[in-house]
């Protein structure tokens, strides 16, 4: 926890270069209790704005208060609670310890009162982010306001068509060598290359039949009947559905009396 180390001369808030503002609320009052030796900067009620980053809470006072800024890293905070009294505004309370070189010593109980609302939203988000930070995870939504070293902050770009730009995607690891890479991509915006159509099968080969036999009126009638029963689908011109093939007729043998002539 540090005193007067997170504000600029122009009244702006200063955060680390690797952090960003996840959430902020105005009209917040900060008070301290349970201190053995109360420094002048910790006396009275501070009014200002509270900010939430991925790793700490920062309070920025309004006006010429002796406490211009107050920073509380999550690892020095404990016993945080969200209170909803019957009378009065909701508030967040807890205990914080001083860090080495932070401008004060010991520990103190703090109380953040949200006079214009937002204590529940801020408190729940703070507890969630603190839990993620303790596990070494990057809090979701850590792409809010960007702050310059001078303390001036840059707002997000204006919305386009009512929607904010999406945050940068997570860099997933490359697939293993045996992973199928998928079809190749085209240079343009056409997406995937469609596979070529199957080759045209060409004319159907005549079925294999037995030895040539002399054509008879009965055989021709049988063939005509089979051709008439075939089915052709215009939607699938490469296939013709035929009935089950019948065995060829027996070979023709002349009568015995003709062999003797």
From Swiss-Prot:
Effect noted on mutating residue 25 to F: No effect on phosphorylation induced by EGF
Comp. bias (Pro residues): 196-209, 245-254
Region (Disordered): 196-261
Composition bias type Low complexity, residue spans: 218-230
Motif extent (PPxY motif 1): 196-200
Result when mutating residue 180 to F: No effect on phosphorylation induced by EGF
Keywords noted in UniProt: Cytoplasm, Deafness, Disease variant, Non-syndromic deafness, Nucleus, Phosphoprotein, Repeat
Modified residues (Phosphotyrosine): 192, 231
Domain of life: Eukaryota
Phenotypic consequence of residue 163 to L: In DFNB107; uncertain significance
Subcellular location: Cytoplasm; Nucleus
Entry function: Acts as a transcriptional coactivator of estrogen and progesterone receptors (ESR1 and PGR) upon hormone activation. In presence of estrogen, binds to ESR1-responsive promoters. Synergizes with YAP1 to enhance PGR activity. Modulates expression of post-synaptic scaffolding proteins via regulation of ESR1, ESR2 and PGR.
Complexes and interactors: Binds to the WW domain of YAP1, WWP1 and WWP2. Interacts with NEDD4. Interacts with ESR1 and UBE3A.
Protein name: WW domain-binding protein 2
Organism of provenance: Homo sapiens (Human)
Native organism taxonomy: Eukaryota, Metazoa, Chordata, Craniata, Vertebrata
């Amino acid at each position: 926890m540090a005193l007067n180390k997170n504000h600029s001369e122009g009244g702006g808030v200063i955060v680390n270069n690797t952090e960003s503002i996840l959430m902020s609320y105005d009209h917040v009052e900060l008070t301290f209790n349970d201190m053995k030796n109360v420094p002048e900067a910790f006396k009275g009620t501070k009014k200002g704005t509270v900010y939430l980053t991925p790793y700490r809470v920062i309070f920025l006072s309004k006006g010429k208060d002796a406490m211009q800024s107050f920073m509380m890293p999550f690892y020095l905070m404990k016993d945080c609670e969200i209170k909803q009294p019957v009378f009065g505004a909701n508030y967040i309370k807890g205990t914080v310890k001083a860090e080495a070189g932070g401008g004060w010593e010991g520990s103190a109980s703090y109380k953040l009162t949200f006079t214009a609302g937002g204590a529940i939203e801020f408190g729940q988000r703070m507890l969630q982010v603190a839990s993620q930070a303790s596990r070494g995870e990057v809090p979701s939504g850590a792409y809010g306001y960007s702050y310059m070293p001078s303390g001036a902050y840059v707002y997000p770009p204006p919305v386009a068509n009512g929607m904010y730009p999406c945050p940068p995607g997570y860099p997933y690891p490359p697939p293993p060598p045996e992973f199928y890479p998928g079809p190749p991509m085209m240079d343009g915006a056409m997406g995937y290359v469609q596979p070529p159509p199957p080759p045209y099968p060409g004319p159907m080969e005549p079925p294999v039949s037995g030895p040539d036999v002399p054509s008879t009126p009965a055989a021709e009638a049988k063939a005509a009947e089979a051709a008439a029963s075939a089915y052709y689908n215009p939607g699938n011109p490469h296939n013709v559905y035929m009935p089950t093939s019948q065995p060829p007729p027996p070979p023709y043998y002349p009568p015995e009396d003709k062999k003797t002539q």
